[in-house]
Curated annotation (Swiss-Prot):
It is a multi-pass membrane protein. Disulfide bonds: none annotated. The chain crosses the membrane at residues 36-56, 75-95, 112-132, 193-213, 226-246, 254-274, 282-302. It is found in: Endoplasmic reticulum membrane. Signal peptide: none annotated. It comes from Mus musculus (Mouse). This is CAAX prenyl protease 2. Ubiquitinated. Undergoes 'Lys-48'- and 'Lys-63'-linked ubiquitination. 'Lys-48' ubiquitination induces its degradation. Deubiquitinated by USP17L2/USP17 that cleaves 'Lys-63'-linked ubiquitin chains. It catalyses: Hydrolyzes the peptide bond -P2-(S-farnesyl or geranylgeranyl)C-P1'-P2'-P3'-COOH where P1' and P2' are amino acids with aliphatic sidechains and P3' is any C-terminal residue. It comes from the Eukaryota. InterPro entries: Rce1, Rce1/LyrA-like_dom. The modification N-acetylalanine is found at residue 2.
Length: 329
């Protein structure tokens, strides 16, 4: 080695090939294949989720307890099997996340308390106007309301109500698991985190088109109004899906999106028209404006990744040679 001298050592150091990113599939000729596998996997998950709702033939409406029980069983089975799709995607693409599958999907203990509280607080701030409206229209005062909320009998009644279980527990948990925890890790290496935030909700929004079938079957309104309603529902579910995808990436946890989803299901779409006709219209409209303003002001600080520890999706992109700074910092 001494005979090589300084020039020889420099020559060896120059000629040594640099270590390539772990997943050449994302930067080489196979990048198209990786994206096709990711998109097809997400499409398959969405079809499986929606299709599971219709494996049970029934003439009863969707809100009938028997229908809710059967459909809840179906989506719980599909969502519990959905991580297998991520495993298959990992094998087909050769991508190694560097963390366990559960961690990648947002099941981890690091930073779990702020991840459960801060996104929900942020969402409640956004709904400041509707919460004020709910409080003004409630016949009971704050003390009586808290007694009802904290009473074990109230919770027991909720836990035996199939519609409440579907809207507040089963739908938020299974939808966030399938459409966020499973789809985002597969889409992010292909599209990057920013585009994935807006691509993932498209599957979520389209998945809600199946409500058209229910409405047409029972002729709940005219065909035109059904399709207008479906288009509106697609729009706001896609926007909501982008928001929970943003929360999932910025916190690295599934619990925040699930709790926010449950809260939004309880609140429903803000009744702006009712607020415009309310006897206390101006305080309500001020509450709506203040809520939106505070939400935009606090969106970045309350989702600062430093509050939640390491971010699995950001680590995944680092290992694949991609650089993401906007959502990861």
């Amino acid at each position: 080695m001494a005979a090589l001298g300084g020039d020889g050592l420099r020559l060896l150091s120059v000629s040594r090939p640099e270590r390539q990113p772990e997943s050449a599939a994302l930067s080489g000729p196979g990048s198209g294949l990786c994206c096709w596998v990711s998109v097809f996997s997400c499409f398959s998950l969405a079809c499986s989720y929606v299709g599971s709702l219709y494996v049970w033939k029934s003439e009863l409406p969707r809100d009938h307890p028997a229908v809710i029980k059967r459909r809840s069983t179906s989506v719980l089975v599909v969502s519990s099997l959905s991580p297998l799709c991520v495993l298959l995607w990992r094998e087909l693409t050769g991508i190694q996340p560097g963390t366990s599958l559960l961690t990648l999907m947002g099941f981890r203990l690091e930073g779990i308390f702020p991840a459960a509280l801060l996104p929900l607080l942020l969402t409640m701030i956004l709904f400041l106007g509707p919460l004020m409206q709910l409080s003004m229209d409630c016949p009971c005062d704050l003390t009586d309301g808290l007694k009802v909320v904290l009473a074990p009998r109230s919770w027991a009644r909720c836990l035996t109500d199939m519609r409440w279980l579907r809207n507040q527990v089963i739908a938020p948990l299974t939808e966030e698991l399938v459409f966020r925890a499973c789809m985002l890790p597969m889409l992010a290496p292909c599209t990057g985190l920013g585009p994935a935030v807006f691509t993932c909700p498209l599957f979520f929004g389209v998945a809600h088109f199946h409500h058209i079938i229910e409405q047409l079957r029972f002729r709940q309104s005219s065909v035109g109004s059904i399709f207008v309603s479906a288009a509106f529902q697609f729009s706001y579910t896609a926007v909501f899906g982008a928001y929970t995808a943003f929360l999932f990436i910025r916190t690295g946890h599934l619990i925040g999106p699930v709790l926010c989803h449950s809260f939004c299901n309880y609140m429903g779409f803000p009744a702006v028209c009712a607020a415009l006709e309310h006897p206390q219209k101006w305080p309500l409209l001020a509450g709506y404006a203040l809520g939106v303003g505070l939400f935009l002001l606090l969106l970045q600080p309350l989702t600062d990744p430093k509050l939640y520890g390491s971010l699995p999706l950001c680590m995944l992109l680092e290992r694949t040679g991609a650089s993401e700074t906007l959502l990861c910092s």
